[in-house]
Amino acid sequence: MICLIVSSLNNTPVGLHGELFKEETIKQIADIMKKKEIEYGHEIYLLSDEPYRELIYSEEKYPFVTNYYDNSLVVYSFSKSLSLPGERIGYILVSNGCKNKEDVYAAIKGAGRTMGFVCATSLFQPLIPKCLGVTSDLSVYKKNRDILYEGLSKIGYEAVYPEGAFYLFVKALENDAKKFSEVAKQYELLLVPSDSFGLEGYVRISYCVSTKQIIDSLPIFEKLYKYYNK
């Protein structure tokens, strides 16, 4: 058995930069995996990590991978959609079309018992059914995104325009994103270098804070920009 884990590549909106995977992309991934299953002569399982599924700013909906590939599993967390970071509550969905699904389901249950620290608390288990379909106020995220993206672009920064999630992926003002992040700390700006995600030269900024914080940060980002463009 081979298990192909596609997490940050196949969650959408992508947690790294907030872009959406289109249906055609999902179809291409599914087609490749089906061909490889035939080539290798056994199942390949696709694990799709989707904690940001509801955090989309348009009417566009992300296609479920289970509709395109039978041997797929979907991992979901309510911590993002309900803005409850750190709460260990979510689910793993095993496709009805998944081969050996009973064995896969049993393995998941066994892993949950073995790693007790990931078990859902008794407090949240009865609450979650009441939260299905509910999300945080996305209008706040959308407003923050627009203010931050437009503000940084006006200053001179280059950034990926996010279609979902709550992160802005910004090109660092020098090749070394880690060093750039250290310099930003001197201006009381906390940035996450993209090296941690396997891509160099960018930083990630979370905008799930108050709108006032976003507005107040722009003059500081401008000072940082001027430091690099003396």
Enumerate the predicted regions with their spans.
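PLP-dependent class I/II
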Residues: 1-230
